[in-house]
From Swiss-Prot:
Organism of derivation: Sordaria fimicola
Gene behind the chain: FRQ
Biased composition (Low complexity): 239-261, 277-294
Biased composition (Basic and acidic residues): 115-125, 438-447
Motif Nuclear localization signal: where in chain: 569-573
Main location: nucleus
Record family assignment: Belongs to the FRQ family.
Role according to the record: Circadian clock component involved in the generation of biological rhythms, in particular in rhythm stability, period length, and temperature compensation. Behaves as a negative element in circadian transcriptional loop.
Name of the protein in its database record: Frequency clock protein
Localization: Nucleus
Region ranges (Disordered): 1-153, 214-311, 381-447, 524-590, 665-694, 889-908, 975-997
Protein's UniProt keywords contain Cell cycle: no
Amino acid sequence: MADSGDKSQGMRPPPFDSRGHPLPRRASPDKSITLHNHRLARDASSRVISSSALGVTGPQPQPTSSPTRRDSSGESNDTGQSDPKSWFDQSNRNPVAAFNDESNIMEVDPPFYQKETDSSNEDSRYPPGRNPSYPPRDTQTQGFRATVAHSSSADDFRSVIDDLTVENKRLKEELKRYKQFGSDMMRKEKLFEIKVHGLPRRKKRELEATLREFAASLGDSSESTSQRRKAGRHGKAVHSSGVSLSKHDSSSSSRSRPVDSAYASMSTGRSSHAAHSSGPSLGRPSLSSKSTSSQKVESYLRDTPDGLLPHHVVMTDKEKKKLVVRRLEQLFTGKISGRNMQRIPSIPSMDAALVSEGTIMAPPRPPPEGSREACIQLQEGENPEKIRSSKGATSASNSGGDQTEVGGTVTAGGDGNGSGGRTVNNTSPPGVIAPDQRPTRPRDLDPDRVQIPSENMDYIRHLGLVSPEFLQGSRTSYQDVAPDAEGWVYLNLLCNLAQLHMINVTPSFIRQAVSEKSTKFQLSSDGRKIRWRGGTDGTKFSSDNGEDKSQKSPLTDDTEDGSDKTGRRKKQKTQQARSEIGRLGLSRSPSDTFHYKPMFVHCHASSAETSLEESASQGSEDFVDESNLANSKWDFSGSGTTQQRRKRRYDGAIVYYTGAQFCTDLSGEPGDMSPTEQMTATGEQEASGSGDEAGRVLQRTLSGSSLLVRPLSDDRARVAEALDFDPQNPPDLVSDDGFSPNDEDFVFPWCEDPAKTQVQPLAKEVMGRSGLGGVLPDDHFAIFVTTRRVMRPTLQRHLSRSTTSEDTAEIIAERLASIRTSSPLPPPRSRNLILAPLQIEYVAGEFHRLNPASLPPPAMFYPPFSTDSSWDDGDDLVSVEEEVEEMEEESFSEGQMSRRANPHFSDNNTYMRKEDLAFDTETDVRMDSSHDHRMSSDSGLMMRSVMRRPVAVDGDGSPLATVTGRDVDMLHTSSSVATAGGAESGYSSSMEDVSSS
């Protein structure tokens, strides 16, 4: 316990060290309970070590505590002065400690003594001060002082964490960049990829062209080589096994082919064990059956089509609808197109591969196997042999796989609706009967296989459904048919045949795709059935225009051309053209047939949102994987302005594929490079034009013309100088013998002496009559102007020089060459053409008034009927009345416009010819009042037709020779003229009787 002196000492303020910091509130080392217990433990351990060194074998005391090892339970030992409360009280009351003295370094451990563990006894093996876990005091002192000096080490750790975070982010960006492999669809066909860092653009294009030709030529050779190797390997193995078995019939041979697969052992069964037994066996199989069974297992495991493998391709709803429509239409057309599908040619069977190898003797053929489909029950009156032969011929002709005909045997591998691998053996003995049906192979379930429409129709008919007539020629009916018509098939059946379950689409989505995208199907009202409209071609989409023709197999092309006469004709013309080109020696390299365009990935460089934009050509962008590009934050579009974005353009790689005449360039090209330039492997550039001409800037006028002069507005001397053309000596193809009056009218006369200037008389009626508003007949005049210009002697010198130049042919050739090009460059601008503007001086001007122009003849209206004609139909009268009313309204508006345009027209009398005003009064005006109502209507119509004429009548109906402006206005406003009483009767109507007294 602490005494009173300690208490008085604890009341004083704690002392400070040399740096001004208060000393730690700790007790002195001599009063520390922890150090006391440590000393006891150290002394006990030293006694044990010394006794063991002297050979004393007495009982060894167990240490009460360990200085280093403590249990995590938190319990303390039963010691005298190990009370924590008293320890803290003593430490708080005696905070003075000597830090400068190295011998008085106090312990920082609290007084919680834990129990010993079994591992703590290991410390007793080391002598005092030699435990590697605890360095000497000097080392501890230095480390403690360093910790005090650097009290805040969290800043150092924070800086390290920041550096690691930045490095981790950079590594993630590089990993995303290297994951851009291009297309998932063509990942298996990838051949190699390169990256270009410091290569010039021209050399880079040469390298790309060379590698394209290499990759295109490698496709055919690699396929043939791989097939030859496989055939050679299997053939050698089979024949080596055959030799060993023939030589050693009674014993096993080490060179015989062992059974190295569980599938092979299961397939062969007991015969496989018997084949490798030491003694002769009656159940030993033949060589052909053994090799065939092993080849079946190998081909089954190896010939899994890519269509059955999972493909994680990101497609939009629009693309998925197109794919659904293509799959459904393929059942009826046998053809499929589009960028999402790719034809996988069927691998020929192993027997055909063995036969094709010339150096290896073919083993005996296995017995014929059954067909893919089950036998359909024959109806009465059908010949089985005829059906079998026709079925075999159909299968052989429509097969989508490779066909090999050897010795009268046709082997078709991987054809349409599940007839892949069918073998029709014409030389088989008649006694051999093939089984009814063979097992299903993986290639038979390939969704990308070639469909045979005839077999699909037979299958639908076999199910009891009435299918439509398929081959209806090229005519296609787009009109809807009646619901009770033939040809309706359940939509669920077609979905199963097309294997649409592999696309993960719902029936409602399929109905929506058919109704929106297809023009060949008709859905029923309930949506359960579907009908094919007919024809041999499917729906054509806009994305099918850029489809690569290389995706179609030769057999598919034959099928398509065979079903269409136009296609067959086109194919024959193409073959003839190719043969002529080959005969003339004008064959082109494979790289010339494909126009290579680099592919640019348009993505925004935002870390939160990325978008994929469609660009480049249709044939190249089909191979961009949207799933890979959507995760990229690199901008390849070239629209950036910072240096960092320019550098990102060249981070991608150039990927080449097996047998493809294109490459995927994810690095892009600079924006100033023209995409129309094509570079071949020989380094020749198809784009014409030298470097100097390419560097020029094409100068055009405001109208878009690249000519330096305007032939219709500039003078002939300047035009002749700019075009190097002499008007006095035209070419032979131009004849100027004829006389053109247009040239005399529009070419102004030239005269060098102003005193001898003569004004030529104008022709009659130089300007025709115009119907513009505000133009009067008196506005007819002419102005004669005499101008003076300065004749430049330089133009004459240039003209004489151009006529005597010897390079006229070269200049014409250059002009023709510039015209043929799509974007002609302007001819070189001469220094002499940059002239000052011409100054025109007006010497004299005369104003001549011409005679007023004659007005056009007045418009006349002749009614389409006479008094002799009688109408019985009232509807005709109504239609005539409507026409007359419309014409009256038009005449009223014309009259108002004429008065506004010619205000003094009403003041002067207008004299007209009397012949125009004369008319038959007996037939037109005078009528008997005893006529009926219908004749009154006719007379009213006739009266209004007469009023439209510029004519006035008096009381007895005689015509007048003079019509005043007021009368004309009255007539134009459709007011009736004076009757027998001489007064106006208001507006005329069709019900009035016009009579004279």
